């Protein structure tokens, strides 16, 4: 039983070593005799004669070299050479070109003949040089300011402005008319209410007069009581009727 387990263990170790060798390559310190040495002591107890293989010399194992398979290499980016920049050469830009008439796009300018025109390089030189600026005579036709340049001088008006003014006036007129109508309506309502109140008060007064007239007539028909001393001396006089109360 022990021999079978030992044989099975040897087979497993051998297969594992084969897989490791395929995955990582051959190692200098790997040898199958290591597995045979572990089982030699067990085999001596079952077999009378054992044959041992001659030992082979091995190089000392370095465990650090087993896993040192990945090597990294870094490459530097080659430097690029650039042309030296000259700050003075910016597309040939120079402020002196503004004073030179020969490098203009429309060609050299013709000298002014005194018939219209605007400012020229000569005028700028006179201003910068300290000399008084004296505009040329008869130059009112070219660069002068006319009434046609003023957008507000014409008689044409924006139609949006006219529409806004008309709408504002219409709204104001409509508001005034509606306010006047509401005032007249309220005034008429108050006058009608006053007439109704006056008629109501007058009707109440008439009812009071009608109710009081029978009492006055009854008082006039009744005679005052006569005492014994004045029964034969003074005749009885009817009482004056009372005025109706309003």
UniProtKB/Swiss-Prot annotation:
UniProt entry tagged with the keyword Signal: yes
Protein's UniProt keywords contain Secreted: yes
Membrane topology value: Single-pass type I membrane protein
Compositionally biased spans, kind Low complexity: 49-58, 71-81
Entry comment on modification after translation: O-glycosylated.
Localization per Swiss-Prot or TrEMBL: Cell membrane; Cell junction; Secreted
Biased composition (Polar residues): 227-236
Region ranges (Disordered): 43-156, 223-246
Biological-process GO terms, alphabetical: cell adhesion; diapedesis; positive regulation of neutrophil extravasation; positive regulation of T cell extravasation
UniProt topological domain (Extracellular) ranges: 26-160
Main location per the UniProt record: membrane
Family: Belongs to the CD99 family.
PANTHER family linked to this entry: CD99 ANTIGEN-LIKE PROTEIN 2 (PTHR15076:SF12), CD99/MIC2 PROTEIN RELATED (PTHR15076)
Protein known as: CD99 antigen-like protein 2
Gene (name only): Cd99l2
């Amino acid at each position: 039983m022990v021999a079978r387990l030992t044989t099975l263990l040897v087979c497993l170790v051998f297969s594992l070593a084969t897989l490791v060798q395929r995955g990582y390559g051959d190692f200098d310190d790997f040898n199958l005799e290591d597995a045979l040495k572990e089982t030699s002591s067990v085999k001596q107890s079952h077999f009378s004669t054992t044959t041992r293989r001659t030992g082979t010399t091995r190089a000392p194992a370095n465990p650090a070299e087993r896993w040192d398979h990945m090597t990294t290499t870094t490459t530097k980016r080659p430097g690029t050479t650039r042309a030296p920049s000259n700050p003075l050469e910016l597309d040939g830009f120079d402020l002196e070109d503004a004073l030179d008439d020969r490098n203009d796009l429309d060609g050299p300018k013709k000298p002014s003949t005194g018939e219209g025109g605007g400012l020229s390089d000569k005028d700028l030189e006179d201003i910068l040089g300290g000399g008084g600026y004296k505009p040329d005579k008869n130059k009112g036709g070219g660069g002068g300011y006319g009434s046609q340049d003023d957008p507000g001088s014409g008689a044409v008006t924006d139609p949006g402005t006219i529409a806004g003014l008309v709408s504002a006036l219409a709204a104001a007129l409509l508001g005034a008319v509606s306010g006047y109508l509401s005032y007249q309506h309220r005034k008429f309502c108050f006058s009608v209410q006053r007439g109704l109140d006056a008629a109501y008060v007058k009707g109440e007064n008439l009812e009071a007069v009608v109710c009081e007239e029978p009492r006055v007539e009854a008082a006039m028909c009744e005679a005052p009581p006569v005492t014994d001393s004045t029964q034969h001396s003074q005749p009885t006089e009817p009482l004056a009727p009372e005025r109706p109360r309003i």
